[in-house]
Regions:
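Active-site His/acidic residue clusters
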Residues: 213-273, 319-333, 533-536, 542, ...
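Histidine-centered active-site microenvironments of extracellular/periplasmic hydrolases
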Residues: 69-82, 241-242, 292-358, 364-367
Length: 644
């Protein structure tokens, strides 16, 4: 899927976003109705049927967080409530913004990468000082031992105070990849939390994510040696903000980044170097995870999977690359956040004892929902028996691709005929303020805070905007932004984007809001684009704007020769129409069983009396409150069986 939360939800639910309402990256304004429901049969619940214990470490981004408790009805227990036995991570979608005061040592903006640079930055740099640690310890650091003492201190969990500077380090400030707010749901049912000043939350996230994954594996192997297990590690990298990783994770000849400006998103070269180094660091840590867990071993300069570990390894990306990091032959203007190939075509790597003839490429269509099926197949679970038919699973089988090498042969037929992707607006009581992202030339209403908008390279047009001429109260819509910009108006992000493709062609449908006199009319207009696509190497045919086959003709004007674009358009249009029409509607049913009954009343009672009766999956009118108005919807539909 184009953004992170919908992809991650499909991994563990096996259902498309239009069935679950998880249509976009979950932010603080999004209601519980657009978060993974506790009534879903998630992967850990599914695998528990076969005795599996399960854990999530790092990022998952399936729910709200305490940044807005009103929209996070399950609180810090949410991952346990969704089925996992253990959670050690964070509920937010990515690292916090970089602390450009470097722990309160300078003014905001002095240190754009979150640490004091060396004196190559003549204005703000320092080559010696004291590294203060959160527990009260300290040590002297200088350029005699470190290229950039300030960065080395940050890597060691500290705050660097240059010699001659009178400043008290502030350990309560979040700082990009080097701090966090970790929530721990223990196997015994107890909970713990490591806030930003806690030494357990300090250090480079990719390293901490690996450490904690290994810690859980050691725990479960010791305490439950006879149980199969599933561990999901959600690495934060390389989500924005881009920030230099520890030097120890990089090749010895890696470029020095101590003088970089991490906040200068217009410096594409610096952005690319940091992207590459963060990927190198993640590669280093994945390697460490696999080796120290006993799943792989070194073989010269390579990594060799060990089939005797009896462990399946799956590595997958959750969405396409962020625009400044995109490389040819992909299209940075149609990357993360869009349903085009650059935004949804991601790596999927599988190793395991059942893989017949490893090192094969599979050229067939695979959807993120299909991982749900693969998890079940690995555990020996029949989804048709384990999941009620009314759940409308979209996952299709993946295991045959691993066990049957014939699928790698030229001319073989894949399991999927078509592949579907989508992104839209999550349900919210009020929309987010507008943010214009110049690299996409688009206005979006996704990000709830100015800092998040700016981390994505955007210009904030909400309250407190620093754009000249914008009122202090900001604008409340992208329509108002375009009225303000006049002839320099930008595109407005579609409220719904979806695409369906087969082996040769791709149909894209976009619904854009309509504006009148600087205000949204509440109406949207559907447009379609149609492309020829393939996975040829080294340069695949992808869906660039200039290649839209419908740009200059109506569908009935498409050619019928060659691969017959006209017939393919008609088939894909019929497929997507049928698919979207399969969405189930059952007013008053909050627990997804397609019935409105006493259980729904009991569940409504639970959520109307907990968390101050705010947002929940029983807030049927989507006003952010679980109240009598929602109970009235249950009462009006009581006894309905929507399966009939």
């Amino acid at each position: 899927m184009p953004p992170c939360s919908p992809s991650r939800a499909t991994f563990f639910e096996g259902r498309y976003p239009f069935r679950t309402n998880v249509r976009n990256a979950i932010v603080t304004l999004d209601l519980a109705n657009s978060q993974v429901s506790p009534y879903e049969i998630t992967t850990p619940r599914l695998l528990r049927q076969k005795g599996y214990v399960s854990a999530v470490v790092g990022k998952m981004h399936l729910s709200g967080s305490d940044l807005n408790p009103d929209n996070n009805p399950l609180g810090d227990d949410v991952m346990r409530e969704l089925g996992w036995d253990y959670f050690d991570g964070y509920l937010d979608g990515g690292p916090y913004p970089i602390d450009t005061s470097a722990g309160g040592v300078g003014d905001s903006g002095d240190y754009p990468c979150g640490f004091v640079p060396n004196t190559r930055d003549a204005a703000n740099g320092a080559d010696q000082g004291i590294c203060h640690l959160p527990g009260g310890g300290e040590s002297s650091m200088s350029i005699d031992d470190y290229d950039t003492p300030g960065q080395a201190c940050l890597e060691q969990w500290g705050v660097f105070v240059p010699t001659g500077v009178a400043a008290a380090p502030d350990f309560d400030l979040q700082n990009g990849y080097y701090t966090g707010d970790w929530i721990i749901n223990n196997m015994d049912g107890s909970d713990d939390r490591a806030p930003v000043a806690d030494s357990r939350s300090r250090g480079y996230r990719t390293v901490l994510e690996t450490d904690r994954a290994l810690d859980w594996l050691a725990q479960v192997r010791e305490q439950q040696p006879d149980h199969p297990w599933m561990l999901s590690v959600g690495y934060s990298a390389i989500h924005t903000p881009l920030q230099p990783p520890p030097r120890a994770l990089l090749p010895s000849d890696a470029e020095q980044t101590g003088g970089y400006d991490c906040t200068d998103l217009s410096n594409i070269r610096q952005q690319r170097v940091m992207t590459k180094q963060m990927l190198e660091a993640m590669d280093h840590e994945i390697r460490r995870l696999l080796i120290q867990s006993g799943v792989a071993r070194t073989a010269g300069d390579s990594l060799q999977y060990d089939p005797h570990s009896n462990t399946v390894v799956i590595i997958v990306g959750d969405n396409g690359t962020y625009a400044p990091s995109v490389r040819w032959p992909f299209d940075p203007t149609r990357s993360k956040g869009f349903p085009y190939q650059t935004g949804v075509w991601v790596p999927l790597i599988v190793a395991g004892p059942m893989v017949n003839q490893p090192d094969r490429d599979i050229g067939h269509l695979v959807n993120s929902t299909d991982l749900y099926s693969l998890f079940a197949e690995i555990a020996g679970i029949d989804l048709e028996q384990a999941v009620p038919a009314e759940r409308d699973l979209d996952a299709q089988s993946l295991l045959p691709y691993l066990t049957e090498p014939v699928y790698s042969s030229s001319g073989s037929t894949g399991i999927r005929d078509v592949n579907y992707t989508e992104m839209g607006a999550n349900l919210a009581a009020a929309p987010a303020p507008p943010c214009v992202i110049p690299s996409y030339n688009v206005c979006v209403q996704i990000f709830p805070q100015q800092e998040v908008c700016e981390d994505q390279g955007g210009s904030w047009y909400g309250p407190g905007s620093e754009v000249g001429g914008v009122p202090d109260s900001g604008f409340d819509s992208c329509c108002a932004v375009n009225a303000f910009l006049g002839e320099e108006a930008v595109d407005i992000m579609p409220t719904s984007q979806r695409a369906i493709r087969n082996a040769h062609f791709k149909l894209v449908q976009l619904e854009r809001p309509q504006c009148e006199a600087g205000e949204p009319t509440g109406e949207s207009v559907l447009s379609e684009e149609f492309y020829s696509v393939n996975e040829e190497t080294p340069v695949p045919e992808i869906d660039r704007a200039a290649e839209d086959l419908l740009a200059d003709t109506a569908p009935d004007g498409l050619p019928e020769d060659g691969l017959d674009p006209r017939a393919n358009y008609a088939a894909l249009k019929a497929d997507i129409t049928t698919l979207l029409a399969s969405a189930a509607e059952c007013p008053g049913d909050g627990n997804l069983d397609q019935r409105v009954d006493q259980q729904d009343l009991a569940n409504w009672q639970r959520f109307s009396t907990s968390n101050n009766g705010m947002s929940s999956w029983y807030d049927f009118n989507h006003d952010g409150h679980t109240d009598e108005a929602d109970k009235a919807i249950i009462d009006a539909n009581f006894g309905n069986d929507c399966r009939l």
